[in-house]
């Protein structure tokens, strides 16, 4: 029935395209009407459209005419030289109907899927122009600085011709330059530049003059799937150096390396014994049928299963797994030990190891034997694995009658410090083990100039300046024997998911989005529209070729390269890591095939390498760097011989990455071909392939070196990829659910901070803080539920110590309710503060004269105090939230939902944060004293130093400079 309705009414995509096509026809009609206009008259259309918008006409109504204006300008500029990245090239683009269709979809808030070479960059100009007519902020977000600069210079020339201003955000631009850029009608930049400016404006800027952004109205995200999905779990973090080094990484790195080496030696021994035993039974090609022999072989396979849990990449294990029957036996043991009834036997087997490595979930676990080895031989401590029960410890202290109240407090402080040290040591130990067992050099990171540089797993690009969080970066530095730098402290953070939700309107464009349409809809409320191609794609997509072993696969790849290279086709070979690209490069050198390598180690030559990749006979080996955002243009000779030939050395866990690699060839009607080579040793195949696939290869194993190639295998691979994508989507959605809690708190704090910065008079905000603090303290200390009881003297003592002020207890005793007492205390505090404020104004006026705005100076002092304590307490809160997030998962043991627990406890933490901010602000305001000096100063400069009363160590001095017109004698 559903299929019948689709055939009758058309799919949702078809109906949307049909509706937008009517608007395309209107655009073309307006384009003809604009043809007779002079250049000046066409430019004036921008002024006219802006005026019409201000008078109430909607953007939707103006869309056909505005898009026609852009199209007409493109036609008029044909042949005009444009400088792009230092080179001159003639403008030669006029939007096709399919590009106009895509532009309409972007304005309507769609993600447009347009194939490589279909002109996404030009398509974006039309919605950018239309939305910039509002005068509100309009941004185009790219994946790197180069593309932002290129697009601004190239297609931005259309916008500038029409009288709009354009700017490009480049990393490292100074404050004043960035403010000027944000004032432009259209701003180009990377997601991180826009995101970090948002964080700086809301966490570092202390005045309106230091804030650069002007809001979030409309954004188009280029390569939207990369930014909103691949990078969604990577938060933007502004951080600074921590207060001190964690000595754990120095102390434990050699001990951890020794424990991992013991594990490696144990697994090597088990694997070698199993291989020798197997060689006695069979020639590794034909499995015997004798039952006793098979049982013996099965026992050796059990040992290899154990090796797979200790060192999954063991060479002997990988060699044995090339035999389909032996692979099946090892997998059979895996299934056997996963059964609930065999759990105890599984634990007994795994107890032989020191560490259990879970490659599938990228995790590990120390066994009892590993812990014992750590204590007995590695010089570790049993306390490294035991956390203190703080409730029990505090209870013991409270019940110890021999301790005085002061001793109990000191003992609790000591216990708390010991608990903190134990947790830090245990955390450092775990991160050192993670670095040794799960983080691979030239896969997850590279080592350069005494530094660890992260490699982006999706793009293959180096990420200098980024660091793994939670001490993992220091652990890798210890592993690789480079300088171990201080752990960073987070000042501000936001995920890209929540940052882009700030925009009133959001759109995107990419060549690969339809496979993630569900996630775009559920997370961002964005629909995906597949835009038809202008020219038919001529790419030949060959079936994947499957080989039993990695060795056979590489042999086949080299043969394919040699064959295609002989015909003259340019070849692009895509690899999944730096390690694989270098390995393949060595093989090609041995076979005397000239080639160029592009990976994270030589990314500086990217533009030069890509420019030559489309030439006749070129061979380029590249990581995922060449899979997205790169446009390989063919020379005429390469087109004649059949275009670019793309070879994939493995399938990525995401289908989109594979589609991006295929999309490098056959752009805009050019010829091209793509083929992927896989082996059953590839990570995707080992961890996520269907059991059906293993059964098939057991029955249909081809001769050595011969490929298996069939659409059925392609389907099975796609199923494995879907399984991984579903798992990753669940992880991203789960992460977002937690970050949504943090996001609400972030927005509340940032709103309060901005209110302080932008308010001309912060005095009412200070009074409000004083009011809340006095209510809270008075209610707490005078409460009958409080341990001190209903005690006004206690209240007086606390107020005198904290602020300090003296209360009129006789007046308070006349009041009969706690609310009345709290209100009276609040009024008294506010009155004292008003008097203090007036005194400060008088002091400054006396010192600097009437020409100085003394009230303004005092307001600036109050503003600085308030912002300082918001920032300090927020940093502490971020640490507390991280700790809560890492610990809350353990609540599942008590049959509790971690997310609900996180929401509940984070709310309590936030209440505590607000309380601590108010108390810190009020304490500081009441302890302020002004010091006026003129010694060794220019005649008209008077420093005003606001210091804390009684030299409180929590509040340092702040100095403001007052420029006075008065002479020195006044």
UniProtKB/Swiss-Prot annotation:
GO biological process: intracellular protein transmembrane transport; protein import; protein targeting; protein transport by the Sec complex
Topology of the protein relative to the lipid bilayer: Peripheral membrane protein
Major place of residence: membrane
InterPro entries: Helicase_ATP-bd, Helicase_C-like, P-loop_NTPase, SecA, SecA_CS, SecA_DEAD, SecA_motor_DEAD, SecA_preprotein_X-link_dom
EC number: 7.4.2.8
KW Ribonucleoprotein (keyword) present: no
Protein name as it appears in the record: Protein translocase subunit SecA
Reaction equations catalysed: ATP + H2O + cellular proteinSide 1 = ADP + phosphate + cellular proteinSide 2
Enzyme class: translocase
Keyword Membrane (UniProt): yes
Keywords: ATP-binding, Cell inner membrane, Cell membrane, Cytoplasm, Membrane, Nucleotide-binding, Protein transport, Translocase, Translocation, Transport
GO terms of molecular function: ATP binding; protein-exporting ATPase activity
A GO CC annotation given for this chain: cell envelope Sec protein transport complex
Biological role stated in the UniProt entry: Part of the Sec protein translocase complex. Interacts with the SecYEG preprotein conducting channel. Has a central role in coupling the hydrolysis of ATP to the transfer of proteins into and across the cell membrane, serving as an ATP-driven molecular motor driving the stepwise translocation of polypeptide chains across the membrane.
Sequence positions that bind ATP: 99, 117-121, 631
Gene3D superfamilies: Helical scaffold and wing domains of SecA, P-loop containing nucleotide triphosphate hydrolases, SecA, preprotein cross-linking domain
Entry's family note: Belongs to the SecA family.
SUPFAM superfamilies, A to Z: Helical scaffold and wing domains of SecA, P-loop containing nucleoside triphosphate hydrolases, Pre-protein crosslinking domain of SecA
């Amino acid at each position: 029935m559903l299929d019948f309705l689709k055939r009758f009414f058309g799919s949702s995509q078809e109906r949307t395209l049909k509706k937008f096509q009517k608007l395309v026809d209107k655009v073309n009609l307006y384009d003809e009407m604009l043809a007779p206009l002079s250049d000046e008259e066409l430019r004036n259309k921008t002024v006219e459209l802006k005026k019409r918008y201000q008078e109430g006409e909607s953007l939707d109504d103006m869309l056909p005419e505005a898009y026609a204006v852009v199209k007409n300008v493109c036609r008029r500029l044909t042949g005009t030289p444009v400088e792009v990245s230092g080179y001159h090239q003639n403008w030669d683009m006029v939007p096709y109907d399919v590009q106009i269709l895509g532009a309409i979809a972007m304005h309507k808030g769609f993600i447009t899927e347009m194939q490589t070479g279909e002109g996404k960059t030009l398509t974006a100009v039309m919605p950018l122009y239309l939305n910039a007519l509002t005068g509100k902020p309009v941004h185009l977000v790219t994946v790197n600085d180069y593309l932002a600069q290129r697009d601004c210079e190239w297609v931005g020339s259309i916008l500038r011709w029409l009288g709009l201003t354009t700017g490009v955000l480049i990393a490292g631009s100074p404050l004043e330059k960035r403010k000027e850029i944000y004032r432009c009608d259209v701003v180009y930049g990377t997601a991180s530049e826009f995101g970090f400016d948002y964080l700086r404006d809301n966490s570092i800027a202390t005045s309106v003059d230091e804030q650069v952004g002007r809001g979030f109205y409309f954004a188009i995200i280029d390569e939207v799937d990369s930014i909103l999905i691949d990078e969604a779990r990577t938060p933007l973090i502004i951080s600074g150096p921590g207060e001190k080094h964690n000595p754990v990484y120095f102390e434990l790195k050699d001990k951890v390396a020794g424990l991992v080496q013991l594990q490696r030696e144990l697994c090597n021994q088990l694997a070698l014994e199993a291989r020798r035993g197997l060689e006695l039974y069979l020639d590794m090609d034909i499995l015997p049928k004798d039952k006793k022999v098979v049982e013996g072989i099965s026992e050796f396979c059990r040992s290899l299963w154990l090796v797979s849990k200790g060192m999954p990449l063991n060479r002997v294990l990988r060699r044995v797994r090339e035999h389909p029957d032996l692979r099946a036996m090892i997998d059979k043991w895996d299934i056997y030990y996963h059964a609930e009834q065999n759990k105890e036997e599984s634990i007994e087997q795994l107890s032989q190891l020191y560490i259990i490595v879970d490659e599938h979930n990228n995790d590990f676990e120390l066994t009892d034997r590993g812990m014992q080895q750590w204590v007995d031989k590695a010089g570790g401590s049993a306390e490294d694995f035991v956390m203190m029960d703080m409730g029990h410890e505090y209870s013991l202290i409270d019940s110890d009658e021999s301790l005085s109240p002061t001793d109990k407090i000191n003992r609790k402080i000591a216990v708390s410090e010991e608990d903190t040290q134990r947790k830090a040591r245990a955390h450092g130990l775990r991160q050192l083990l993670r670095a040794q067992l799960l983080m691979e050099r030239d896969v997850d990171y590279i080592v350069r100039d005494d530094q660890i540089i992260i490699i982006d797993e999706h793009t293959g690009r180096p990420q200098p300046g980024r660091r793994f969080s939670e001490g993992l970066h220091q652990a890798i530095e210890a592993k690789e024997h480079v300088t171990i730098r201080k752990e960073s402290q987070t000042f501000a953070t936001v995920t890209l998911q929540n940052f882009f939700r700030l925009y009133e309107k959001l759109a995107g464009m990419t060549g690969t989005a339809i496979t993630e349409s569900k996630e775009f809809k559920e997370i961002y409320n964005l629909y995906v529209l597949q835009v038809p191609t202008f020219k038919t794609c001529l790419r030949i997509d060959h079936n994947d070729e499957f080989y039993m072993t990695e060795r056979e696969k590489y042999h086949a790849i080299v043969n394919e390269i040699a064959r295609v290279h002989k015909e003259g086709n340019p070849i692009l070979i895509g690899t999944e890591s730096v390690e694989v690209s270098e390995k393949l490069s060595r093989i090609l050198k041995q076979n005397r095939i000239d080639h160029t390598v592009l990976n994270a180690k030589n990314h500086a030559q990217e533009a030069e390498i890509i420019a030559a990749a489309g030439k006749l006979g070129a061979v380029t080996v590249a990581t995922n760097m060449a899979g997205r955002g790169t446009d390989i243009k063919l020379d005429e000779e390469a087109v004649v011989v059949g275009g670019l030939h793309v070879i994939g050395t493995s399938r990525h866990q995401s289908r989109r990455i594979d589609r991006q690699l295929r999309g490098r060839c056959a752009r805009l009607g050019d010829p091209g071909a793509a083929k992927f080579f896989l082996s059953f040793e590839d990570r995707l195949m080992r961890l996520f392939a269907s059991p059906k696939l293993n059964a098939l290869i057991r029955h249909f194993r081809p001769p050595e070196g011969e490929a298996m190639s069939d659409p059925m295998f392609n389907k099975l691979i796609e199923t494995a990829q879907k399984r991984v994508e579903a798992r990753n989507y669940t992880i991203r959605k789960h992460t977002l659910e937690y970050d949504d809690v943090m996001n609400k708190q972030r927005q509340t704090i940032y709103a309060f901070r901005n209110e302080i910065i932008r308010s001309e008079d912060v005095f009412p905000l200070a009074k409000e803080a004083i009011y809340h603090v006095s209510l809270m303290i008075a209610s707490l200390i005078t409460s009958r539920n409080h341990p001190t009881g209903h005690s006004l003297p206690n209240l007086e003592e606390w107020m005198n110590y904290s602020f300090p002020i003296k209360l009129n207890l006789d007046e308070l005793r006349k009041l009969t309710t706690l609310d009345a007492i709290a209100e009276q205390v609040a009024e008294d505090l506010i009155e004292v503060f008003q008097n203090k404020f007036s005194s400060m104004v008088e002091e400054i006026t006396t010192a600097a004269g009437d020409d100085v705005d003394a009230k303004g100076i005092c307001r600036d002092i109050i503003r600085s105090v308030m912002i300082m304590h918001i920032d300090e307490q927020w940093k502490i809160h971020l640490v507390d939230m991280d700790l809560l997030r890492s610990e809350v998962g353990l609540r599942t043991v008590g049959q509790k939902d971690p997310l609900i627990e996180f929401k509940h406890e984070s709310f309590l933490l936030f209440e505590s944060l607000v309380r601590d901010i108010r108390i810190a602000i009020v304490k500081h305001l009441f302890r302020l004293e002004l010091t006026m000096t003129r010694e060794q100063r220019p005649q008209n400069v008077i420093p005003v130093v606001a210091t804390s009363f009684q030299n409180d160590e929590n509040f340092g001095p702040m100095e403001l400079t007052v420029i006075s017109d008065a002479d020195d004698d006044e």
